[in-house]
Every structure is written in C-alpha cells, then in structure tokens.
Amino acid sequence: FRSGTVFHLFPMIRLSDILLSYAEAMHHAYGMSADPEGYGLTAIEAVQKIRTRAGFGTNDKFLNGVTDNNFMEKVKQERRIELCFEEHRYFDLRRWMDGNQLKEPIIGMKVEENASGLHYTRITVDEARNFKDYMYYHPIPLKVIKESPYIQQNPGW
C-alpha cells in the first residue's frame, strides 16, 4: 500500500504457496512425476524446489519412497510446515475434506523456568471444538438466493 511517498510491498502469496498448490493440482491431474502438457515442472519437482530453497539440498530424505498413493500426505505435511503461521491450515483441511482433524483438541505448551532450566508441559488449550460436514461449504448469502430461483442454499445452512 502507499503511505505518502513511501511504498510498502507486502506479499499476498508466496512462491512456496504457489509451488505447493501447483504440486497438488499436478498430482491430481497427472500423478506426481508426469508433466504431459510441458509445464516444465512435475508435482514432485515442485516440492523438491521448495525443500532445496529451504536448505535441505540434494540429500533430502523427505521424499524417499514416496509413491502416487502417499504423495498427497507429503504435500499436506509440507504445507503445514512451510505455511505455518500464515493462516492456511483451516482452509487446507476444508479443501481436503479433512475436517475430522478440526475436531481434535488444540494442544499447547506451558513453559516454566526452574532451577534446572526450562520445563515444558503439554496442555490442552481448547477441547470443545465442533466441526460438522456442512461446514466444508460456506453459506450462500440470502440476497443471492432471493435474486435467483435456481440457486439453493448449501445443505446445513
């Protein structure tokens, strides 16, 4: 945004997010190691590019033994790590229809200092979470439904 004569550049989407979305789409369309349309990057190469940039280099064992059957689990794990603190997780879980993970309690860490140093204790931060199947989809605004007789509200809303 612009403030007086100074420009502030703020990234709306990072290259890692683009590459992980690309890897997910390529995997669903062609598998993890095919690029039949000639886009220049397979799904597995997109993930490797992120891992290389992060400093894992050529000896990275993260993708060892990966197959088309378990590749998406690796993409999900990489998104969780690479995009942590960027508020993608909730929407990723909804897109993947993995809402059951949203029902699990949130676990935090209580850190206390004592004579021998720091002591870490796992604590439950929130256990009353509720996620129903209808929550995978947003409700359609009532105004939109009233304007068209062909549009119906998403189930559950």
Enumerate the language-model features and the residues they cover.
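Acidic/polar-rich alpha-helix caps and helix-coil junctions
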Residues: 1-157
